[in-house]
A protein has these predicted regions:
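Amphipathic alpha-helical segments
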Residues: 13-28
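N-terminal beta-strand motif that seeds the catalytic metal site of vicinal oxygen chelate
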Residues: 1-15, 45, 59-62, 112-116
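Short secondary-structure junctions
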Residues: 25-32, 81-87
Length: 116
């Protein structure tokens, strides 16, 4: 069964959101990037991504651990996924991306998300 393991949120004020989630939910900063900060509660990853001209505030991507991509691919298509599975670059946490019927990005990781 696929499991939600990652969520990325675009923010016009990354520092404010990092402070909110680390204070209110006691999440830990697990690593930083020039344009994002990654938090974890030990089971779930949350990335706060800087807003830019291409990204609007709000949901950027929802990430799932998946066990069987072949079965899931058929389920995604039957449920109305708005795109086919797209392979992701090797340095990406997920192996594939697909979009739900509303166009939201879904990242699929076969190897599992690195949760610290």
């Amino acid at each position: 069964m696929p499991r939600i393991r990652h969520l990325a949120i675009v923010s016009p004020n990354r520092e404010r959101l990092v402070n909110f989630y680390t204070t209110a939910f006691e999440m830990r900063v697990v690593y930083g990037h020039p344009t994002s900060t990654h938090l974890s509660d030990g089971d779930f990853n949350l990335a706060i991504v800087d807003q830019n001209s291409d990204l609007k505030p709000g949901l950027y991507v929802l990430g799932f651990d998946v066990d069987d991509l072949q079965d899931l691919e058929g389920s995604l298509r039957n449920a109305g996924a708005s795109s086919d599975l797209t392979p992701m670059p090797k340095d990406h946490d997920a192996e594939y991306r697909v979009h739900d019927p509303d166009g939201n990005r879904l990242d699929l990781a076969i190897h599992g998300w690195c949760v610290v």
